[in-house]
Amino acid sequence: MACVTTVGLGVIFFLFRVFSSGYTHMSICTPGFELEEFVFKVHRNHLHSGKRLGKVTFNNCDGRTRTLFQSIDKRFEINTDGTVTLKRQVTLHEGHKVFSVHAWDSSGMKHTASVRVERVPAQVESSSDVDLTKNKRVKRGWIIPPISVSENSKGPFPMRLVQIKSDYAIETRLAYKITGEGADLDPKGIFTIDRLSGWVSVTQLLDREKKASYKLRAHANGVDADVTEKPMDIIVTVTDQNDNKPVFTQNPFNGNVPEALEKGEVFMTVTATDADDKENTDNADISYVIISQDPPSPKPNMFAINPVSGGISVLEKGLDREQWFRYTLVITATDMNGEGLSTTGTAVITVTDSNDNAPLFEQSSYTASVPENQVGVEVAKLPVTDGDEPESTAWSTKYQIIAGDKGGFFNISTGPSRLEGIITTVKPLDYEKTKQYILSVIVVNDDKFVGPLPTSTATVTVNVKDVNEPPEFIPKEKFISRPENLPVGSNLIPFTAIDPDTEKKQNITYRIGNDPSDWLNITGSGQIQVKNALDRESSNVKDGKYKALILALDNDVESPATGTGTLVIELQDVNDNAPVINERTIKLCNRESAPVLLSITDKDLPPFAGPFKVEPQGDTSKNWSVFFNETGHFLNIKPQSQLEQGEYKVVLRVADREGESQENIIQASVCDCKGEAFQCTDKQVAGIPLFGVLGVLGGILLLLLLALLLLMFLRRKSNSKKEPLLPEDDVRDNIYYYDEEGGGEDDQDFDLSVLHRGLDNRPEVFRNDVAPTFMPAPQYRPRPANPEEIGTFIDDNLKAADNDPTAPPYDSLLVFDYEGGGSDAGSLSSLNTSSSGNDQDYDFLNEWGPRFKKLADMYGGGED
């Protein structure tokens, strides 16, 4: 009995230990999601904002019901109780959506689970719910679970994925097949289906980066019965695996950082990409880290990088371009938020200059001398130095005069080198007023200083040099008003100048510089007088004002100077001009003519001008009517009665308001016409009546008739003469002695009667060496009565003689170089060989006609 009791106690103790140990083991709790993947099913592809999808559960092991969740896809929001809702509208393009969810337990450890939102068909009535006793057709449907396959799966292949079925399979045997991309379309053969069971299998390894999903279509047909199921689309989703490293978009990255950039400011960004799924997984979530910095000065961690964005910023102060102008950073990009695959890149950072060095003048003081009265003169150049980067805005300089130039006489500008200030004068300096200027000049950069920097200052002492200045008229332009009828010699006004060189005690003399009308004179004391009569109506007077240039000259020995002043005389008008009619010639008809409008001008101004008065003078008042038009500014003139055609002088005396007048003569051409159609005929010529014209024409005709009768008489008388009218001393029959030196041509000894009669009226003139051509004899002009026409007369008769076939031999072409046989004249050498004149026989000269009678009488043995 004791033994049984002992055994019983041992069993009880053993059971207690077992249960106690089991209880202890069961009491250990591990925080985490209750599922690795939560699936939420929806019945449509378009999900609206605010829709509640489901709930994820997380065990904290501390009894808390609320947990901090974070969705990788920002379109989904997870409350602390695990409820998943949509923040904005989502469309399931592939029929599903997968994203990651993070949760943190009480110790701060992060946990991750997947959430899958997939579309499923609306719930259809299953075959178990159909009342077979009712004679009703039941709507059929497919049973297709979601299909997903992980990329890079190693099989074995073919690897079953899911089994699809149709409700017709309850009634009859079905044969299944699939079509679409990956089945019978490229890429072909990736997916297959068992014809009778409906198992869908994949035949090879898939790559999501090449194709993330495949769209198939399922078909079912009856084997034993004529049954065909409506085709159904199937989406096969390839889930991502982290099989791609991040890749930097460029390598290296280049950036610039100002040496005075504040801490935390981002100045450049590096980026990398990952081909893995970024929407549904964290396989493409990249984290950036700086691995090394070269040079590690002044501190090894001068820069920081944002792990998510890749933005690089300044972490520590101390960048100095003058010491370390470039840094090289080695950066890694790791996916899965820094826990996956990684790659390495480089960022090259160039430190750009900041204005941390103030420009400094090379000297603290300068001295310069400038002559007075000169503008634009360079006073001094102030060179500076700057330790910043050359040609940068932190290096180039600008200047300012801060003291010593209250009058604004100087300007300072940056020189071509951009490291010098150039002071110039912008106003003329006056030695007599200020002999010395002390200027304070500062220099700064175009860019602002970084931090508090001292400003360099220089002092410039400018000494003004005295030069001889021209006398100055005060005022430089003087206005006076005087009447234009001032008598010659009258004083107008004293116009004097002062010498600004008060220390020299110089004398000033005056001259007239420019006096266009020569009206003025100036005395040695500067008194301006009237030299010639003034005239306000002169062309040199503009707007009633006359300007003259006055000169003032000093007597400096080295460099005498001349000052100028302008005298403006406003001439007051007086009545010294009579009115004038502008139109001096008019034309009008003598019948029904409209009045001719005349305008009157007066050089004088009111009240010395209009209204005007007009008085016809002499016979004008008898033949012409003169009156003003309705405006009173224009004068109308017309004949009082019908006048004969001709030229008339119309004399009008025009007077102004004060009676200043003068006569105006208007030449009026009157034509025998009507109205305004002015057109003259030949009825009158130069004012001579018609009968006078006829008388003149008759006299001319009578004179022409008498001249014709006289000419006929002379021709008849000339035909009755037997002997030619050749004077004894005809120029062509004279013997000239050419051995007389100094003798001239008697070019005035010609017989006009020979030219007058013509050769055709002299029957004794003939040629026996030319056959007659029976051409009509030319007609020669008679001798003109007017001696001035002799030239024309000779030219015309010369042309007629050239064409006359009966012209004498001296008018024909002679060949003088032929002296052969048959020539009656023989050779000229015979004149020398003959012993006397009797050896020659000159009887043939008698045959040459009367033109050679004189020669025949001398040598032919005839009468003396």
Curated annotation (Swiss-Prot):
Topology, Cytoplasmic side: 714-864
GO biological process: adherens junction maintenance; adherens junction organization; calcium-dependent cell-cell adhesion via plasma membrane cell adhesion molecules; cell adhesion; cell migration; cell migration involved in gastrulation; cell morphogenesis; cell-cell adhesion
Signal peptide: 1-22
Localization per Swiss-Prot or TrEMBL: Cell junction, Adherens junction; Cell membrane; Endosome; Golgi apparatus, trans-Golgi network
UniProt-annotated glycosylation sites, renumbered to this chain: T271, T344, T457, T459, T496, N555, T562, T564, T566
Matching SUPFAM superfamilies: Cadherin-like
Ligand binding (Ca(2+) 3): D274
Extracellular side: 23-692
Protein's membrane topology: Single-pass type I membrane protein
Residues engaged in binding Ca(2+) 1: D243
Entry-linked Pfam families: CADH_Y-type_LIR, Cadherin, Cadherin_pro
PANTHER family: CADHERIN-1 (PTHR24027:SF319), CADHERIN-23 (PTHR24027)
Comment on protein domains: Three calcium ions are usually bound at the interface of each cadherin domain and strengthen the connections, imparting a strong curvature to the full-length ectodomain.
Its job: Cadherins are calcium-dependent cell adhesion proteins. Required for normal cleavage symmetry and compaction of blastomeres in cleavage stage embryos, maintains convergence and extension cell movements during epiboly and gastrulation and promotes prechordal plate survival, potentially as a result of its role in cell-cell junctional complexes. Promotes organization of radial actin fiber structure and cellular response to contractile forces, via anchoring of radial actin fibers to CDH1 junction complexes at the cell membrane.
Summary of subunit composition and partner proteins: Interacts with ctnna1 and jupa during early stages of oogenesis, interactions are no longer present when the oocyte develops into the unfertilized egg. Interacts with ctnnb1 during oogenesis and in the unfertilized egg.
Name of the protein: Cadherin-1
Species: Danio rerio (Zebrafish)
Name of encoding gene: cdh1
